């Protein structure tokens, strides 16, 4: 049945060609003209930059203080060892960070299979070479930190933030969290009945083995869909600004005059005049206070100095004083 000319075609055929356990081709068709590049480019960017995964971030090698050194009995220099560790493919279940250990001695290659780990960790490519020992008496021991993350985080961005707490000998590694190693897409012509102007999207990708290519495509599509949800309904969902209700009086005015820590003589004179709060006091003038029995110029000067230190003065006018909270007492 012929659909409306305003309706968009939806892809109805998805073919997955599993070239190997880490290499697959995904075909999606038919797509309206132009949508092949639109979807292909979006998925490619997400697969390269936004897929979560696990990567080596720090390494401690016994007897090594910095990455620009060598280790006796080891064919590779430390920089090359770090580069090999960067390519380690690790799958971690239920944790964001794990510590792996490696201890090896004697002539021969040191591979990922020599790494000791618990049941939550899986080394996907145990044959991955880390270095070579060239002497029967040679040995190498290291602690490897693996963390969960997203995208690519170079070591240089973490150096300054961790410099104060990072001990000497702990080497930082560029963290490549993305499990997708290579991705490319191609848009070919597709046909539905009499229409020949349609697109067919072919995505070819390789992973490091920690994620199935089909699952990677599914996750990327989910991320894209979640990001686009906000555009489906463009109603203004911003919450109205809640204006903070300003207090009617400065809190200091509601405090008792005892908080001013006046001398006993001055404090007793104020209480005799029913001046219990700082708000009561600042409304009095100098003339009014001098009329208070036993309160002389020395006490008046003390009161003025104490008020001035708090940004207050005598003779202030306070509208609606006293507040209900005080008037009810």
Curated annotation (Swiss-Prot):
Changing residue 45 to C: In rpoA112; temperature-sensitive, blocks RNA polymerase assembly. GO terms for molecular function: DNA binding; DNA-directed RNA polymerase activity; protein dimerization activity. Residues 162-165 are annotated as: Required for interaction with Crp at class II promoters. InterPro entries: DNA-dir_RNA_pol_insert (IPR011262), DNA-dir_RNA_pol_RpoA/D/Rpb3 (IPR011263), DNA-dir_RpoA (IPR011773), RBP11-like (IPR036603), RNAP_asu_C (IPR011260), RNApol_insert_sf (IPR036643). One of its GO terms (cellular component) is membrane. The keyword Transport does not apply. The keyword Coiled coil does not apply. The modification ADP-ribosylarginine is found at residue 265. It catalyses: RNA(n) + a ribonucleoside 5'-triphosphate = RNA(n+1) + diphosphate. Disulfide bonds: none annotated. Pfam families: RNA_pol_A_bac, RNA_pol_A_CTD, RNA_pol_L. Changing residue 191 to C: In rpoA101; temperature-sensitive. One of its GO terms (biological process) is intracellular iron ion homeostasis. The modification N6-acetyllysine is found at residues 297-298. Acetylated on Lys-297 and Lys-298 in the presence of glucose. PatZ controls acetylation of Lys-298 but not of Lys-297. (Microbial infection) ADP-ribosylated on both alpha subunits by the phage T4 protein ModA. ADP-ribosylated on only one of the alpha subunits by the phage T4 protein Alt. Residues 1-235 are annotated as: Alpha N-terminal domain (alpha-NTD). Homodimer. The RNAP catalytic core consists of 2 alpha, 1 beta, 1 beta' and 1 omega subunit. When a sigma factor is associated with the core the holoenzyme is formed, which can initiate transcription. Both the N- and C-terminus interact with different regions of transcriptional regulator CRP. The rRNA transcription and antitermination complex (rrnTAC) consists of RNAP, NusA, NusB, NusE (rpsJ), NusG, SubB, ribosomal protein S4, DNA and precursor rRNA; S4 is more flexible than other subunits. The N-terminal domain is essential for RNAP assembly and basal transcription, whereas the C-terminal domain is involved in interaction with transcriptional regulators (such as CRP) and with upstream promoter elements. NCBIfam families: PRK05182.1-2 (NF003513), PRK05182.2-5 (NF003519), rpoA (TIGR02027). This is DNA-directed RNA polymerase subunit alpha. It comes from Escherichia coli (strain K12). The gene is rpoA.
């Amino acid at each position: 049945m012929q659909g409306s000319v305003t309706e968009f075609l939806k892809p109805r055929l998805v073919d997955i060609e599993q070239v190997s356990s880490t290499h697959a081709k995904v075909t999606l068709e038919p797509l309206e003209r132009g949508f092949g590049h639109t979807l292909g480019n979006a998925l490619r960017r997400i697969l390269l930059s936004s897929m979560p995964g696990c990567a080596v971030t720090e390494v401690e090698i016994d007897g090594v203080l910095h990455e620009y050194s060598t280790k006796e009995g080891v064919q590779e220099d430390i920089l090359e060892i770090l580069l090999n560790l960067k390519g380690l493919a690790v799958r971690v279940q239920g944790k964001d960070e794990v510590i792996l250990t490696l201890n090896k001695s004697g002539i021969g290659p040191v591979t990922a299979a020599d790494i000791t780990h618990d049941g939550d960790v899986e080394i996907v490519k145990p044959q991955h070479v880390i270095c070579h020992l060239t002497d029967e008496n040679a040995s190498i021991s290291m602690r490897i930190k693996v963390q969960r993350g997203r995208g690519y985080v170079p070591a240089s961005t973490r150096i300054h933030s961790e410099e104060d707490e990072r001990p000497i000998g702990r080497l930082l590694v560029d963290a490549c969290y993305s499990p997708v190693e290579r991705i490319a897409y191609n848009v070919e012509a597709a046909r539905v009945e009499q229409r020949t102007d349609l697109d067919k999207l072919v995505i070819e990708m390789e992973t490091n083995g920690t994620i199935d290519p089909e699952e990677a495509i599914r996750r990327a599509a989910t991320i894209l869909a979640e990001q686009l949800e906000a555009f489906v309904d463009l109603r203004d969902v911003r919450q109205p600004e809640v204006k903070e209700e300003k207090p009617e009086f400065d809190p200091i005015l509601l405090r008792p005059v005892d908080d001013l820590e006046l001398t006993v003589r001055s404090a007793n004179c104020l209480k005799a005049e029913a001046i219990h709060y700082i708000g009561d006091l600042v409304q009095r003038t100098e003339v009014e206070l001098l009329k208070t029995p036993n309160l002389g110029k020395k006490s008046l000067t003390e009161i003025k100095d104490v008020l001035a230190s708090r940004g207050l003065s005598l003779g202030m006018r306070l509208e609606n004083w006293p507040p209900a909270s005080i008037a009810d007492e």
